[in-house]
Amino acid sequence: MKTDANRWFPRSFTLFILTVLFVLLASPAFASGYDNALKGVTKYNALFEFSQGDPKMANLIFWAVRNSYQVDEVKSLKEKPNVVVVFHGPAVKLISSDKSPFNAAQSAEVDKFQDTIRQMKKEGVRFEVCLYAAKVVGVDEKTIMPEIDRVGNGFVSVIGYQMQGYAVVRIP
């Protein structure tokens, strides 16, 4: 037979466990996991060398690219994050107004991708496209989004930013 004391114990114990879990999970030590990676870091200079031509995959990847400079730990660094994306290869088709290489579903993904680029540009991200790559994949320079700076050879940009201290993340 259950008494009031028997009913009280399981509820209070459960409440205690939930409180402890909440405190532990809300603790900064458990929140990020970036303590080792950002130890001593004062600035965030990142260059993403992007060649991925699949629109759906590009959207998934760009969520992570965008999130990388939006996390609180990066935003709280002494210097504002500097992010550059250089487009090469098949990725150049994703930044063109010519959607003929894509079916309807892919075209919708391209529109979403281009909207993300516009938003990231407003957030201060710089974009460059390799015009040699555009020529190789058959993209007319005139169809490239106006938010994206044109460079003759994207490798020169990648090397230049790397020499300036940017971390290079290659996304094939």
Each language-model region and where it sits:
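N-terminal secretory signal peptides that target proteins for export/translocation
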Residues: M1-P10
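Bacterial N-terminal signal peptides
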Residues: S12-A26
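Short stretches within intrinsically disordered, low-complexity N-terminal or propeptide regions
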Residues: R7, P28-A31
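Secreted/extracellular ectodomain signature
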Residues: F30-P172
